[in-house]
Amino acid sequence: MIDWVDRNTYMERLWALEGTRDIKVITGMRRSGKFELMKAFSASVARKDPSSNNVYIDLLDLDNEPLLEYYVLHHEIIERHKEGARNRLFIDEVQLCEGFEKAINSIHARGGWDIYLTGSYAFLLSSDLVTLFTGCHREVHILPFSFGEYRSYFGEQGAADDEFAGSYDYDDISESYGFLRRGRIGTERRSRGTRSESGAPR
C-alpha cells in the first residue's frame, strides 16, 4: 500500500483556481480524501512558490481548539498575514468552528488571502455555500477512490479483470462480465453447485 495516490483531476482543478479571488471550498463525503487532497495541494504550492506565506490550520487538532471560536480564528488569521508575501490560507474541517462564515467573509473582504477550505458535505451543501459566502466561492466536490485509484493505492499491478467479484478462470472471458450485466456471477453453467428441479442443491 502506498501513502498517496495522485488525484490529478482534482489537483488540476485546484491549480486552475489558484490565485483567484473566490473562496475555494473542497467538499465531499467522509473519508473521501478532502484532507489529503488539500494537504497535497498546499505542499505543492509551497514547493512551487517557496517565498509565499502558507498558513495551514487543522481544526481537528486539539492544539487549535481555541480557534473553534470564530473571533479567535479571525484574529489568528490576521496575525499570521505577512505584508509583501503571497498569503494562502488553508483550513481543514472549517465547519467545526461555529460561525466560521463570519471570520472567513471578513478575511475575504479584507483581501490579501488566497483561501482554501475543506468541510463535510453533511454540513456544507452547495445551497448552504451560496448563503454562507454570498456566492463568492468555488466548490471542488470530490468523490471516494475510483476503481483505478483503489488499485493504485493498494499497489495492485495485475489485470483489472481479476478484481471483479467472483473472479476465477472462465472458459470465455466475456462470462466475467455476467455479474455486471445480470447481477450474478458468471453463467448458469458456471454456478457453484447444481440444483435439482426442486431448487435444492444436489
Regions picked out by a protein language model, each given a short descriptive name:
Residues 26:
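Hydrophobic anchor at the beta1->P-loop junction of P-loop NTPases
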